[in-house]
Amino acid sequence: MMSIDITTNHKIIFGDARKMDEIEDESVHLVVTSPPYPMIEMWDELFKMLNLEINKRWMEMENEEDEEKKEKLIMQIYNLMHQTLYPVWEEVYRVLVPGGIACINIGDATRKINGVFRLFPNHSKIIENFEKIGFVTLPYILWKKPSNKPNAFLGSGFLPPNAYVTLDVEYILIFRKGKPRKFKPKDPLRYASAYTKEERDRWFSQIWEIVGDKQTHPKIERRTASFPEEIPRRLIRMFSIIGDTVLDPFLGTGTTVKAAIELKRNSIGYEIDKSLKPIIEEKIGIKQKRIGMDFNVEFINRG
């Protein structure tokens, strides 16, 4: 990869990504994000806050005695959670350039509600919604998280038939806005962004084995659900060139912005939780002198 001197700009907005008024149409080249996972317990309260109808149906479900009606309410809640994310995906389509790529890290959910254990296939719901908006679905990546822990098999242990398969992969879904992006012949920034044969062979295989990131941070006593830096680093190298703009509408602790800075891409991040600001500042090294990196960071607080 050739060395290119470039000053990059990074904008971190504390606000709801369902309206990204700060971003112009067709001005983003790549989206890398991991949204809240519907029907994963740690995200229940956030979804209830973002969509009061979810809170209402949840209370109805807990008070309902008829099993058939409970079942319907559970599926209504699941669908409402995905409907809550849908405006973000519409905004992603609006801001992407023609040929721009969106990479969505999502896991399916397993959960026992009202005594019934079930799978909630989040990845298929995301694909359905992206295609409804107009995206082209590309082959996805399976992120397998290696673990030294013995598998926590669910169900009846060694006795068939009532045990359940353990979910040990997440999906990195890949979508494109329209036809492939076009470049000028011998574009210097594109050539400077090239990866090696070894990188290509490893990155473009469907299964990635990457150790998951810590889910807690010492400065806040709760889970942050951040993905490991290796994931946005690979995706940014694979699907953008130096000088491009990368968007993460669910920024969390700032992993995508950090990777964008180090890979000489511009970036924009949205985060609804303002308390994460000091963690983001620490992660991206805003108070540190970074050798060989020239970048500007702007924080915006919506009123």
UniProtKB/Swiss-Prot annotation:
Superkingdom classification of source: Archaea
Spans through the membrane: none
Cellular component aspect of the GO annotation: cytoplasm
Transport in keyword set: no
EC number of the protein: 2.1.1.113
Protein keywords: DNA-binding, Methyltransferase, Restriction system, S-adenosyl-L-methionine, Transferase
Pfam families for this protein: N6_N4_Mtase
Keyword Glycoprotein annotated: no
Catalytic activity from the UniProt record: a 2'-deoxycytidine in DNA + S-adenosyl-L-methionine = an N(4)-methyl-2'-deoxycytidine in DNA + S-adenosyl-L-homocysteine + H(+)
Disulfide bonds: none
One Gene Ontology biological process: DNA restriction-modification system
Stored InterPro entries: DNA_methylase_N4/N6 (IPR002941), MeTrfase_CN4_CS (IPR017985), RM_Methyltransferase (IPR001091), SAM-dependent_MTases_sf (IPR029063)
Annotated Gene3D superfamilies: Vaccinia Virus protein VP39
One MF term in the entry's GO annotations: methyltransferase activity
Enzyme kind, highest EC tier: transferase
Family: Belongs to the N(4)/N(6)-methyltransferase family. N(4) subfamily.
Name of protein: Type II methyltransferase M.MjaI
UniProt organism field: Methanocaldococcus jannaschii (strain ATCC 43067 / DSM 2661 / JAL-1 / JCM 10045 / NBRC 100440)
